[in-house]
Amino acid sequence: MIHRERMRDHFVTLVRIDSPSRQERALAMHLAEELHHLGAEVSFDEADRLVGGTVGNLVARIRGTRAGAAPFLLCAHMDTVGADVGIRPRVEGDVVSSDGTTILGADDKSGIAIICEVLRVLREEAIPHGELEIVFTICEEIGLLGARHLDVAQLHARTGLILDSSNPGHLITRAPAANRLQFTVRGLEAHAGVSPEKGINAIRIASEAVAAMRLGRLDDETTANIGTIEGGTAINIVPNTVTVHGETRSHDEAKLKIQTEHMVRCFEEAAARHLLSLDGVIHRGQVHCQVHRDYDRLFIPEGARIVQLVREAARALGREIALWQTGGGSDANILCAKGLEVANLGTGQREVHTVREHLVLSDMVRSAELVLETLRLQAA
């Protein structure tokens, strides 16, 4: 059975170990030792060299105890969002939170704690299981970089679970594809008080472009956002350069393409409206647009083996599991694009990426119970 207090205490220990993106080494070494004591063979890949980090993805393997059972993958990410360190967790009844000055790190250390607790129970109770592969990735929060550089050809498992969402009653089988956009706008510098008519204001071009865009929730499948605007040097200078970053996501590739092209067109049209003649030379606003595919969409069909397994496990526990569509990406997007069949199960984390982030312990237990039952059935 799942030990609630042990799993809670382990989670609290994990969140006290700082692990911002690219700085996961201390946590990784701690987990490597724990997994070794649980009978795992532990190694690290070289993803850190590709992303400028301090440690690679942790890949662990536990031999199966049931002959013929298929290998199974369990995955979570080690990094926490932003630069928060010195997290001070507080336990109050069924909830773990931070002290309100930082994130908590339940995203995704709750997933790590669940995986470790399940492994302990399998070992303590001698529950038969197939070969287990555990992957704790790096740099998920800054573009799913760890998963992106993971060599899945080295894994034996083709099916598995990622523990990195909220509700343990939801199995995420659909998530959007996402494009990241960068717009570099160039105008013409001038003195803002003496000769503003000799300048082309790059901030104004960017403002007009953003104002013309369709942003927010566009429909039930598509979203778009402008996240940062950087530019200008002083209030008395007509700014000549602005950089704007945005994104768009959709479950429909055609809609994603249309929205991406719309955002690019808004900038191109805004830049084209700004031109002036100066000493016989025509100056125009310019924009350079870069579009980068962040990740492909996640779509796992209802008849997939992982869906059947988790549903059967839920029924065995007297529960229902809902197949869920989310607007966020996860390592599951990357791993499924690489040919694995990996769904995302909730852990009890709430209000992630904010100082209000917290973990509901009863949900964490429910998630661990479901993972344990899934592994039991996988080996049946």
Residue positions per predicted region:
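N-terminal capping segment at the start of a domain
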Residues: 1-25, 293, 350-354
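A non-catalytic alpha/beta surface segment that caps or lines the substrate-entry region
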Residues: 20-67
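Acidic, glycine-rich active-site loops and adjacent beta-strand->loop/helix elements
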Residues: 48-50, 78-80, 135-143, 165-167, ...
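Active-site metal-coordination/substrate-binding segment of hydrolases
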Residues: 53-57, 61, 68-136, 157, ...
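Acidic-glycine-rich active-site phosphate/pyrophosphate-binding loop
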Residues: 79-94, 172-184, 311-312, 343
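Glycine/charged-rich beta-loop-alpha catalytic/anionic-binding loops adjacent to active sites
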Residues: 90-103, 186-190, 317-318, 349-353
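Acidic/histidine-rich catalytic neighborhood of metal-dependent amide-processing enzymes
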Residues: 100-176, 218, 224, 235-236, ...
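Metal-dependent amide/peptide-bond hydrolase catalytic core
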Residues: 202-380
